[in-house]
Amino acid sequence: MSSVLVTGSTDGIGRETARALVGTGHRVVVHARDERRAVDVRVAVPRAAAIVVGDLASLEETRALAVAADREGPYDSVINNAGVGGTACRETTVDGLELIFQVNVLAPYLLTALMAQPARLVYLTSGLEAQGRIGLDDLQHARGRWDGERAYSDSKLCDVLLAFAVARHWPEVRANAVDPGWIRTRMGGPGATDPLPLGAETPVWLAVSDDPEALVSGSYFKRRRQLRANPAAYDEDLQRALLARCADLTGVTLPR
């Protein structure tokens, strides 16, 4: 039995992932953005070992979440599932940071940097990472005309870079990125082609399986298969630069 933290577990892929893990006998700690959603996830995943609460659109709450989550650990695996989709207009958080970048990139970085190291880290990305571009001087899309889909795609490429950077930084930890597919969730929309259980399958497999194919690090997966990510994700200088920008924006450096 493994102990697993799943962020963003109140609906969609995160909730399905938590249910699948609990259903196969694993100890699961679930995460909700606020107390109201915590009530919902307790109903949805009644056998969860614990619920931790924190809004990933707040650096202060994300730091507190790392502490609260560690109290419920240690973990064999952490699945960084929580995320937000493209927005119609550029939104900023209480920290003055762009919402999509903060929730999708800075929050998993901060949790990774602050929490005790698990044996495995899984970062959910999207097939749209293939369309992403990294502009280190404008990661938060403050310049030019706002494009929510572009901001989302770029954030998902950042998630792949983050997974690969962590894999290199911590060779003793298995860190991988997962494209769950176009899943029928609130974010995926009614036109999505893939059923919800399929979206949870590969994150669960990477988090707990002893299959040799799952015991790797620094890889990009879809449907339990290693695929090639956006070529930019393999740029080690870009990986280091992203870690440095995340450290600057959060005030926390990824420890050795």
Specify the residue positions occupied by each region the protein language model found.
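C-terminal helical subdomain
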Residues: 177, 193-240, 244
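Conserved glycine-rich Rossmann-like NAD(P)H-binding loop of the short-chain dehydrogenase/reductase
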Residues: 24-40
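Rossmann-fold cofactor-recognition segment
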Residues: 45-60
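Conserved Rossmann-fold cofactor-binding substructure of NAD(P)-dependent oxidoreductases
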Residues: 57-73
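Catalytic loop of short-chain dehydrogenase/reductase
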Residues: 83-84, 88-89, 97-98, 120-172, ...
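Conserved hydrophobic beta-strands of the Rossmann-like cofactor-binding core
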Residues: 3-6, 75-79
